[in-house]
């Protein structure tokens, strides 16, 4: 074969190409590696971790959604790397699960403990609070969060509600008040009008915060009781 013919064979062969979507996942892995680098300042590592999460949200909104549309339309043409939309989705399912597992591992096994060593405690359970702090958290929920929570039940007469992109939502099993009927599924959107980070007044040099979704989870029975 001539040089030009060899170049044409390489250009037309899928084995010489990487799928665009899988390449993006590899890019997010490289960003995540920055969050895992112990030589980088702690808050910079947290920033890199948050970037990977934000990237993943946008990736699903645009690229994964586009692949799903093509699959639903019966589109079977292969991309330059030789993969159909369905094959790409299957490969992404594996690759993204690995990425998310690594995200959680980085946060829970490394960054979270470093935050605590530096005096920043992220509260996830009511039992982690002192009596005084618990009173503050309960009051904050009743005065600021509860008024803007709206549980939306899902049943045969009420289809699954439209979930906004990048919104935080909680799934809950609810039952009508004073009823023995079966539990029903409901969604509760975490209010976007409030700060996601709630600082808890505490004594000493430590700083305690609770995320709005965790605060809502702790009190989730309150808005669902009257249903």
Q: Where is each model-derived feature located?
A:
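His/Asp/Glu-rich acidic catalytic environments and adjacent acidic regulatory segments
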Residues: 20, 141-217, 221, 225
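Secondary-structure capping and boundary motifs in well-ordered enzyme cores
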Residues: 19-24, 44, 52, 81-88, ...
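Single conserved hydrophobic/aromatic residue that forms the stacking wall/gate
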Residues: 1-10, 218-227
């Amino acid at each position: 074969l001539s040089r030009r013919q060899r170049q044409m064979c390489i250009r037309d062969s899928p084995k010489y190409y990487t799928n665009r979507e899988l390449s993006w996942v590899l890019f997010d892995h490289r960003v995540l590696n920055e969050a895992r680098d112990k030589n980088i300042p702690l808050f910079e590592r947290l920033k890199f971790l948050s970037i990977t999460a934000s990237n993943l949200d946008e990736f699903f909104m645009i690229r994964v959604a586009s692949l799903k549309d093509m699959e639903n339309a019966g589109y079977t043409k292969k991309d330059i790397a030789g993969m159909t939309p369905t094959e790409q989705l299957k490969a992404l399912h594996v690759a993204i699960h690995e990425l998310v597992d690594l995200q959680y591992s980085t946060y829970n096994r490394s960054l979270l403990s470093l935050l605590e060593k530096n005096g920043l405690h992220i509260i996830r359970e009511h039992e982690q609070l002192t009596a005084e702090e618990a009173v503050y958290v309960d009051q904050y929920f009743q005065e600021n969060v509860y008024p803007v929570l709206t549980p939306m039940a899902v049943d045969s007469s009420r289809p699954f509600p439209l979930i906004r992109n990048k919104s935080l939502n909680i799934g809950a099993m609810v039952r009508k008040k004073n009823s023995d009927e079966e539990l029903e599924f409901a969604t509760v959107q975490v209010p976007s009008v409030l700060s996601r980070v709630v600082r808890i007044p505490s004594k000493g040099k430590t700083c305690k915060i609770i995320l709005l979704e965790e605060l809502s989870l702790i009190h989730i029975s309150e808005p669902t009781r009257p249903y």
